[in-house]
């Protein structure tokens, strides 16, 4: 990795071509270009429209339940300080995105995109989903606004996320199991893109993460940045200053980008993204694109990808369906190369330990995705002084993972 010269601001990207340095861009079929340009124009107009922002805020407050709390994890903090040298052990806070309607951060972005689809007159919404959280959020808002909803989901994920599949169907969505490839998130995204090309006139593709062709990475980031903006205000209100460090899990990376982006130019704030190391990066069974991948093109953008020796997209593995993706958002790839964000990885076993500990100490059952981030908080917090303020994004709740985790622990539900 080469550290490029530091820019005046880390928050000005992407450029007019949708690039973050050499990452991002628009690598799509010609048939999609008019749609992409139409979407970009609609988003740029909506972004500047006070009525659109007011609508976002109103539904955010009254339907999603924002702002989400910034919660001092007191027992976890005490537990970690007991293991640390005297005077060590950061004060750990959770940004409680799991308390949002539908149970994760995903709804922040979906609300923005569905309001945009309505402005554009698109009555049919398609989405891809891995853990099912983005699918549930999309189905929920389609139900709220009376829009047709089709969700593509890898057949493997359909099996391991049965509660969310049922939720989507209850909300009126059509769930399409994808049997091609590895039958996970990558393949679901491929099928959604095929659908979009086929149904250009009436369909809006609601992408769930900071990936895909421009303007999606920037648009999803902007809709998720409410997380970081609230965190800044809440921490100043509670502690009189901004946090010293931020930690979030990364699949495509939307929850992380939402927390990180408002702090990127606060150079004193340490920022950590946590990828899924699966059975260990050396095992080859992982989803850590930055740790174990290299630059390439997938799903319309250039970013870090897991590839085999022939340059083909490799299979990703994670205990968490939401992190089981062989790429990462292009802005994360750029921040990695710029050295502004430190990217770590957590194994399945480390994640399960954090999952158990959080449940027992804080009475909060985390989703397996943020449990990855929490496993690194357990390592990082004891290395920081007691006055250090560390915020972890609790990006989803663990209800959806209970059947899977119970089975791992030998309990049949």
From Swiss-Prot:
Assembly: Tetramer of two alpha and two beta chains.
Gene3D superfamilies in UniProt: 3.40.50.1100
Catalytic activity line of the entry: (1S,2R)-1-C-(indol-3-yl)glycerol 3-phosphate + L-serine = D-glyceraldehyde 3-phosphate + L-tryptophan + H2O
One CC-aspect GO term: cytoplasm
GO MF terms, alphabetically ordered: tryptophan synthase activity
E.C. code: 4.2.1.20
Cofactor: pyridoxal 5'-phosphate
Name the UniProt record assigns to this protein: Tryptophan synthase beta chain
Record-listed N6-(pyridoxal phosphate)lysine modification sites: 106
């Amino acid at each position: 990795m080469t550290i490029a010269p530091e820019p005046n601001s880390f928050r000005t990207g992407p450029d007019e071509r949708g690039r973050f340095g050499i990452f991002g861009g628009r690598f799509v079929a010609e048939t999609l270009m008019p749609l992409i340009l139409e979407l970009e124009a609609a988003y740029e107009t909506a972004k500047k429209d006070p009525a659109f922002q007011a609508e976002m805020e109103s539904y955010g407050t009254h339907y999603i339940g924002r702002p989400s709390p910034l919660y001092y994890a007191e027992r976890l903090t005490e537990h970690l300080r007991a293991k640390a040298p005297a005077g060590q052990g950061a004060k750990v806070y959770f940004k409680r995105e799991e308390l949002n309607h539908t149970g994760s951060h995903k709804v922040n972005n979906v609300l923005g995109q569905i309001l945009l689809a309505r402005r554009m007159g698109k009555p049919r919404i398609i989405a891809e989903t891995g853990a099912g959280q983005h699918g549930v959020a999309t189905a929920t808002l389609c139900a709220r606004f009376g829009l047709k909803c089709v969700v593509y989901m890898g057949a493997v994920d359909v099996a391991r996320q049965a509660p969310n599949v049922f939720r989507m169907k209850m909300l009126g969505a059509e769930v399409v199991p994808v049997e091609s490839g590895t039958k996970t998130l990558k393949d679901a995204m491929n099928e959604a893109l095929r659908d979009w090309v086929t149904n250009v006139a009436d369909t809006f593709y609601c992408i769930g993460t900071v990936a895909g062709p421009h303007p999606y990475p920037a648009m999803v980031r902007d809709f998720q940045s409410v997380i970081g903006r609230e965190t800044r205000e809440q921490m100043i209100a509670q502690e009189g200053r901004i946090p010293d460090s931020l930690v979030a899990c990364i699949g495509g990376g939307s929850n992380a980008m939402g927390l990180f982006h408002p702090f990127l130019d606060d150079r004193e704030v340490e920022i950590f993204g946590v990828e899924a190391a699966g059975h260990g990066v050396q095992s080859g069974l992982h989803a850590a694109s930055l740790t174990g991948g290299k630059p390439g093109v997938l799903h319309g953008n250039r970013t870090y990808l897991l590839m085999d020796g022939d340059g083909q997209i490799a299979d990703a593995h994670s205990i968490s369906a939401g992190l089981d993706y062989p790429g990462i958002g292009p802005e994360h790839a750029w921040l990695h190369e710029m050295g502004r964000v430190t990217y770590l990885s957590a194994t399945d076993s480390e994640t399960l330990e954090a999952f158990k500990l959080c449940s027992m100490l804080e009475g909060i059952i985390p989703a397996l995705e943020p449990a990855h981030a929490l496993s690194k908080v357990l390592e990082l917090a004891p290395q920081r002084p007691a006055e250090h303020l560390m915020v972890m994004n609790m990006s989803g709740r663990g209800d959806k993972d209970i059947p899977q985790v119970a089975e791992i622990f030998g309990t049949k539900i």
